[in-house]
Amino acid sequence: MDEKLGKFIDDFAQLVQIAQSGQHRVQAGTQLLTTITEHLAVPAESLAVVVEEVPAHRFVDADIRMAELAAEDGQFRLVGIGGGDQRHHQSLSDMLQQSQFFPQFPLSQPDYINLAVGPDEQRQAVALGLWLFRHAGSPVAVLQRDAAPRYGRQTACLEVLAADAKNAADFLAEFRRRMQRGSILKGQVISLVMGEYGPSSGGVTFHARPELTASDVILPEGLLQKVADHALGIAAHRESLNAYGQHLKRGILLYGRPGTGKTHTVRYLLSQSAGITAVLLSGGSLARISEAAAMARALQPSIVVLEDCDLIAEDRSFGHGPQPLLFEVLDAMDGLDHDADVAFVLTTNRVDMLERALAQRPGRVDLAVDVPLPALDERIGLVTLYARGIPFSPDAVRDAAARTEGTTASFARELVRRAVVRAALDGTPVSDSHLLEAVDELMADGETLTRSLLGSGPAGGGDGQGGFGGPGFPGPGFPEPGFGGPGIPGPGIPGPGFGSVGFSGPG
């Protein structure tokens, strides 16, 4: 053998030995296996680990309950686990088994994560920590972990070890009872968000409850009260309804042109429902409807709001899983118990895109409300509302409202803003002339697209849901019975429509 080759082989063998000795090196400090074995008084590696998964939106609740249960033992300990990233990739059982041969998991400080518990509040929750305490007189060890999709862990979990399997089962039964007893989500306004790794990894966002009065919502007389009575008033008489065997769950569909006040009406409902849990879904978060319905059932009385629900009928590939999202919504609305105090509030700009099963089936949607374009009196009220604190004269407000027929609430808000902007550019106080100049500007022929973006199409239309003028495509529609009303005609190809009369194709 060549002398250089022999030396290379010897050097390489020494390198392998050094690498292997590094793997077998014992980490300094008290080891995980030793600690749990001493606490349970039996070899920890011989015990079965019981895993309890916790949804991402309930992790703060789980942290609160774990702290309560551990604190009942005045001698409890909370410790962390060292060992670098390996601890994130291995289960508690794996760590204990590996520690028999390669003790690489010394005790350290717990890992924490800051999580919201309200619009302006946060809690420091245990992200990775080992609870050592006695429950009902028996020692228990619980490893608490938050969800970490980047390490392959999609949900938070508790990994429970006890000397006797019954002790572990009793502890988890008590943990579940306390989780069902209450939640930091109850009575809050929250929206479900999509996580980077899919719906199951998403959490919740807390929102401050809106502060609105009936005078802040300008709708035709009696319309707002009708919606509020159905969404909120029924719950006030739940005992009477239950006594007569009538269901509490209800569905409300708010439909109409964009910008007419559907979302503002929802905000009013939220403002008048203090103490009621509200779950908001829109856009991508509509894929979490099943989860939202389960939360609403657990946290009732509650309201589930689905914004722009026509999207789920328009795009059947929207949902995650084998079922189209539309059918998930139907199942969620129809799957609740009759005594569940849950209100579903759906909004849509395109009622013709919703299938008959969603719009007409009793128990799913039992109140459909057309939120129309504001008439003259409503337009006066809208300009007055958005001009609070601005010295417009009543005559100027009426003139502006009269000249903006066929426009929406969003248009009225933009009209007042334009008047203020013009005054700022002129360097003068806001006056009637600025308001009327803003009317001239927004109603000019060159601002057709701007008016359309504010939900205000050409004036005119029929009794039903307003269509959009201009060339378009036919609406899909369904045969009667349905929602009648010719809408606003356009030169496009007419569609079969939703109901006996139908809609013109949207522009």
Which positions does each model-derived feature cover?
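Hydrophobic side chains in well-ordered alpha-helices
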Residues: A62, N167-F175, T265, A292, ...
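AAA+ P-loop ATPase mechanoenzymes
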Residues: M1-A236, K249, G466-G507
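Short, glycine/charged-rich beta-strand-loop motifs at protein surfaces that mediate ligand recognition
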Residues: L161-A162, D370-V371, A401-E405
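Walker A/P-loop NTP-binding motif of AAA+ ATPase domains
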Residues: A214-D395, G469, P474, P479, ...
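Residue-level signal for secondary-structure boundary elements
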Residues: G74, L78, S183-G187, E239, ...
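C-terminal alpha-helical "lid" subdomain
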Residues: R361, L376-G507
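Aromatic/hydrophobic pocket-lining residues that form π-stacking "cages" and hydrophobic walls in ligand
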Residues: M66, F175, V266-L269, A292, ...
